[in-house]
């Protein structure tokens, strides 16, 4: 089988396997910088729903035991919404005990990679009208397939470039030997 035939076969197999429910194991490396993330809630448009958004918090002052203030509620109005948005600081607890230097944003601890639960893409079923839509894909699947296609194209380009130079090199060697 020619190298281009092998490459085509590899491309087809690589694109078909993820659709059959066979996934590669993801290896993640964790560093001390990746141990915390910002707790972010992205608002989505739904009728008659209250939208919440996480806002950066100012440094928390240290109060004496007898002067502890009540938690304050931040209210914000977005364009195109009828009601106010309410963010309660009590719902997003900061991990200041674990990270005493992080004073400017509300942080939550990232679970360790060993406790992350990977679900099979075939078991995830979108809710609503997307169930029967053949053109609907979740973001994880799109990213995975996009990276796969990019990797195949990258390797194909390298093979094409190196095969052309190898031909020229072998031709050059033959001409010098004569």
Swiss-Prot record:
GO terms for biological process: microvillus assembly; negative regulation of calcium-dependent cell-cell adhesion; positive regulation of sodium ion export across plasma membrane; potassium ion transport; sodium ion transport. The chain crosses the membrane at residues 146-164. CDD domains: FXYD_FXYD5 (cd20323). Residues 1-21 form the signal peptide. Belongs to the FXYD family. The keyword Transmembrane helix applies. Regulatory subunit of the sodium/potassium-transporting ATPase which is composed of a catalytic alpha subunit, a non-catalytic beta subunit and an additional regulatory subunit. The regulatory subunit, a member of the FXYD protein family, modulates the enzymatic activity in a tissue- and isoform-specific way by changing affinities of the Na+/K+-ATPase toward Na(+), K(+) or ATP. One of its GO terms (molecular function) is sodium channel regulator activity. Residues 22-145 are extracellular. Residues 103-125 have a biased composition (Polar residues). It comes from the Eukaryota. Associates with and regulates the activity of the sodium/potassium-transporting ATPase (NKA) which catalyzes the hydrolysis of ATP coupled with the exchange of Na(+) and K(+) ions across the plasma membrane. May increase NKA activity by increasing the apparent affinity for Na(+). Involved in down-regulation of E-cadherin which results in reduced cell adhesion. Promotes metastasis. Keywords: Cell membrane, Glycoprotein, Ion transport, Membrane, Potassium, Potassium transport, Signal, Sodium, Sodium transport, Sodium/potassium transport, Transmembrane, Transmembrane helix, Transport. Glycosylated. The lineage of its organism: Eukaryota, Metazoa, Chordata, Craniata, Vertebrata. It is a single-pass type I membrane protein. The keyword Endoplasmic reticulum does not apply. Residues 26-36, 68-77 have a biased composition (Low complexity). One of its GO terms (cellular component) is basolateral plasma membrane. Its main location: membrane. Pfam families: ATP1G1_PLM_MAT8. This is FXYD domain-containing ion transport regulator 5. It is found in: Cell membrane; Basolateral cell membrane.
């Amino acid at each position: 089988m020619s190298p281009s035939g092998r490459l085509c076969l590899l491309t087809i197999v690589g694109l078909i396997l993820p659709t059959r429910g066979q996934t590669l194991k993801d290896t993640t490396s964790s560093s001390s910088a990746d141990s915390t993330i910002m707790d972010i809630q992205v608002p989505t448009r739904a009728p008659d729903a209250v939208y919440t958004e996480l806002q950066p918090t100012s440094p928390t002052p240290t109060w004496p035991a007898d002067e502890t203030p009540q938690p304050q509620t931040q209210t914000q109005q977005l364009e195109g919404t009828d009601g106010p948005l309410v963010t309660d600081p009590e719902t997003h607890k900061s991990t200041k005990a674990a990270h005493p230097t992080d004073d400017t944003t509300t942080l939550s601890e990232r679970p360790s990679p060993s406790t992350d639960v990977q679900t099979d893409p075939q078991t995830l079923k979108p809710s609503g009208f997307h169930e029967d839509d053949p053109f609907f894909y979740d973001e994880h699947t799109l990213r995975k397939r996009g990276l796969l296609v990019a990797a195949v194209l990258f390797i194909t380009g390298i093979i094409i470039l190196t095969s052309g130079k190898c031909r020229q090199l072998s031709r050059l060697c033959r001409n010098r030997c004569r």
